[in-house]
Amino acid sequence: MSRRCQITGKGVLTGNNVSHANNKSRRRFLPNLQETSLLSDILGSAVRLRLSTNGIRTVEHNGGLDAFLLSTPNRKLPTEAQALKRRILRAKEKKAEATA
């Protein structure tokens, strides 16, 4: 399981710890990832994702998982999010066919 947000693509960064005496030692800056379940209205079920806390805020700010994915262009989404977006689009088309 990679340390990367499945919505925003935020991952591990590297840098230095710098002491008061200006000694440098390498370190890793890990993203604050949380395993969360987000409800998809179109799919009618909860989707488990590994998101950064910033990614959770972004999804909620944009009106939920479905609204966020449908309004975001594919070039800005990681591959996992693009696959989920395709699932949502297919389910939306099936619902449109069923009502028509």
UniProtKB/Swiss-Prot annotation:
InterPro entries noted in UniProt: Ribosomal_bL28 (IPR026569), Ribosomal_bL28/bL31-like_sf (IPR034704), Ribosomal_bL28_bact-type (IPR001383), Ribosomal_bL28_sf (IPR037147)
GO terms classed as biological process: translation
Keyword check for Ribonucleoprotein: yes
Gene Ontology cellular-component terms listed: cytosolic large ribosomal subunit
Keyword annotations: Ribonucleoprotein, Ribosomal protein
Keyword Ribosomal protein included in the entry's annotation: yes
Family as reported in the entry's similarity comment: Belongs to the bacterial ribosomal protein bL28 family.
Protein name from the UniProt record: Large ribosomal subunit protein bL28
Organism: Gluconacetobacter diazotrophicus (strain ATCC 49037 / DSM 5601 / CCUG 37298 / CIP 103539 / LMG 7603 / PAl5)
Classification of source organism: Bacteria, Pseudomonadati, Pseudomonadota, Alphaproteobacteria, Acetobacterales
Gene transcribed to yield this protein: rpmB
